[in-house]
Amino acid sequence: MTNLLPEMAEIWQQTLNWQPTDSQQARFQQLYELILEGNRQLNLTRITEPQEFWEKHLWDSLRGVAPQQQLISFLPVGASVIDIGTGAGFPGVPVAIIAPNSTMTLVDSTRKKIAFIESILKELGLTNAKTLVSRAEEIGQQPQHREQYDVALIRAVGTASACAEYTLPLLKLGGLAVIYRGTWTEEETTSLENAVRQLGGTVELIDNFTTPLTNSVRHCLYLRKVAKTPANFPRAVGVPTQKPI
C-alpha cells in the first residue's frame, strides 16, 4: 500500500496564497516515495509519516521562498538558485518543482547523498536542477560560482553567521539569501547584523511564523546582497563554524 501525501489545498492557499498544480502534486508524491525508498540504504530523514513529511519537508521548504506568505513574486523567471547543504534535497528539490523556469544547483559534501539526489532528479524529470559535490567555503572562492546566483537557500546548517558567510559570497549584487531557522532571538539578530555587514549584506527581513499542522515555531532570515563581499570571505573549510564572524 502506497503512503499517500495529503493534498492540503486549503492550507497551501491560506499560508502561501498558492496551490500546487496536479502535475506538481504528483511530483511531490513521487518525491515522497523516492525518499522512503532511499531511506532504506541512506539515512536521509527521520520524517517519513505522510502528514509530517508534508509539513516539515514540503511546506517548510516552500514557506521559505514565500516571505510574508507571498510565493509567486519571489522567484523571478530565469532565477539562478543554489541550495547549500541540501542533504535529502530540501529545500531545493521542492523549489525546483514549483519554479520550472529557474535553475537550481543542489550542493552537498556527501557524495552518496548527491548520487541519490541525481537519481531523484532523473526520476522526476527535473531538467532545471543539477548537483554539485562540494562545500560552500570552496565554491564561494571559485569564479564559476562566486557572485553567480540570484537566490541562495540554506536550511539547518550551522550558526546564522556561518550561513551568512556561506551564502553571501555566492550572490550577485541584489541577490537574496534565505536562512531557515527554528527559534530566533533579538540577541541573535544583533550578532547576525554585525556579521552580515562585513559580508556585503543587510538583514532585510526576519519572518516568524508557525507551521500549519503542529504549530511549531519557525523563522526565515532574508539577507540582501548590497555590496561586494570582501575577497577573504568565505574563509577556509570549517573556519566559519569554528570562528564565527
Swiss-Prot record:
Membrane spanning residue stretches: none
Subcellular location: Cytoplasm
Annotated S-adenosyl-L-methionine binding sites: 85, 90, 108-110, 136-137, 155
GO molecular function: rRNA (guanine-N7-)-methyltransferase activity
InterPro entries, per database record: rRNA_ssu_MeTfrase_G, SAM-dependent_MTases_sf
Gene Ontology, cellular component aspect: cytosol
Gene3D superfamilies, per the entry: Vaccinia Virus protein VP39 (3.40.50.150)
EC number(s) reported in the record: 2.1.1.-
A Pfam family recorded for this sequence: GidB
UniProtKB keywords: Cytoplasm, Methyltransferase, rRNA processing, S-adenosyl-L-methionine, Transferase
Tagged with keyword ATP-binding: no
First-listed, main subcellular location of the protein, grouped into a coarse class: cytoplasm
Similarity comment: Belongs to the methyltransferase superfamily. RNA methyltransferase RsmG family.
Reported function: Specifically methylates the N7 position of a guanine in 16S rRNA.
Protein name: Ribosomal RNA small subunit methyltransferase G
Lineage of the species this protein comes from: Bacteria, Bacillati, Cyanobacteriota, Cyanophyceae, Nostocales
